């Protein structure tokens, strides 16, 4: 699991060394809109995966993030490819995801 505490800021980065099967967000404000942008850098030699269907917000149950058109999110697979993924929360609800992908 990738633990993300919004009390520590609203940006972060990770280089994939293993598959990410779930995200655990804490300290997401319960009133209004908040965001977290994550820079994901793909592994240099063997592609890893990122799942958005096992997300917890402030200790709640697992939810699947919503994406434009319901198409989901697939992390870029090229060696060292960079994705910028923004999670948008409204009142600490199910996150909406926007991704800019495959920077190289």
Where are these regions (language model features)?
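Acidic, glycine/polar-enriched metal-coordinating patches/loops
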Residues: 15-104
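Short carbohydrate-recognition loop motifs
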Residues: 8-14
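Extracellular beta-solenoid/beta-roll
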Residues: 1-8
């Amino acid at each position: 699991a990738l633990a993300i505490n919004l009390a520590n800021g609203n940006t972060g980065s990770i280089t994939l060394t293993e598959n990410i099967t779930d995200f655990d967000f804490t300290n997401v404000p319960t009133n209004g809109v908040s965001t977290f942008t994550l820079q994901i850098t793909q592994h240099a030699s063997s592609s890893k995966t990122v799942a958005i269907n096992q997300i917890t917000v402030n200790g709640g149950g697992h939810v699947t993030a919503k994406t434009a058109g319901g198409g989901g999110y697939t992390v870029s697979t090229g060696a060292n490819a960079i994705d910028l993924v923004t999670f948008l929360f409204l009142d600490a609800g199910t996150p909406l995801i926007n991704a800019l992908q495959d920077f190289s």
